[in-house]
């Protein structure tokens, strides 16, 4: 079974950046978000994971940059939009901009009734981001605790969530390897598909994630590993096939 790869473009203050463990102020600047996204599309990406960090942290938004990327590249690549989608207005804006899928994080923890209603309305165009420390969820740009992972999943499964994007916060941006045990635990407890995020540092990490494909881990987000040139996207795509 093949693995779908989603190169990440995280946008802060109009620039493409990478954070360490999701901490505000830890970013490394990688220049134009549009150029970053175009680089991954030209290298063969079928999906881009596009994140508005300012919206996630509540420090503004980068809607103009995100809209440009979707407008210019949306006919060549599927875009998963994430960051600050917490209500009808922000969700509608993301979908109207042309996102193929929208990733809901904090709202799923703070407003479960709303999350249930949009899952029912939009189906597989809505994924839920589960950002985890141990078995505890992190919320609002990872600055607060949001409850037990498996209790939250039980509720989301009951309302028909079709995909979880699972990030071990301790691993993200650290190039220390993914939390395979966490991914296995999540995938074994749900019929929803699972996207792995955080910690991928070498091609063997992708091979390890690919072994979980048969239990529902069908995709992986690539961030720091690509920007730090640990491997090329072409090399990663060859492993993921």
From Swiss-Prot:
EC number(s) given by UniProt: 5.3.1.16
EC main group: isomerase
Subcellular location: Cytoplasm
Pfam family name, one: His_biosynth
Primary localisation category: cytoplasm
Entry annotation: catalytic residues: 10, 131
CDD domains: HisA (cd04732)
MF annotations from Gene Ontology: 1-(5-phosphoribosyl)-5-[(5-phosphoribosylamino)methylideneamino]imidazole-4-carboxamide isomerase activity; phosphoribosylanthranilate isomerase activity
Pathway(s) where this gene product acts: Amino-acid biosynthesis; L-histidine biosynthesis; L-histidine from 5-phospho-alpha-D-ribose 1-diphosphate: step 4/9
GO BP term (any one): L-tryptophan biosynthetic process
Catalytic reactions on record: 1-(5-phospho-beta-D-ribosyl)-5-[(5-phospho-beta-D-ribosylamino)methylideneamino]imidazole-4-carboxamide = 5-[(5-phospho-1-deoxy-D-ribulos-1-ylimino)methylamino]-1-(5-phospho-beta-D-ribosyl)imidazole-4-carboxamide
A GO CC term assigned to this protein in UniProt: cytoplasm
Keywords: Amino-acid biosynthesis, Cytoplasm, Histidine biosynthesis, Isomerase
UniProt family annotation: Belongs to the HisA/HisF family.
PANTHER family in UniProt: 1-(5-PHOSPHORIBOSYL)-5-[(5-PHOSPHORIBOSYLAMINO)METHYLIDENEAMINO] IMIDAZOLE-4-CARBOXAMIDE ISOMERASE
Name of the protein this chain belongs to: 1-(5-phosphoribosyl)-5-[(5-phosphoribosylamino)methylideneamino] imidazole-4-carboxamide isomerase
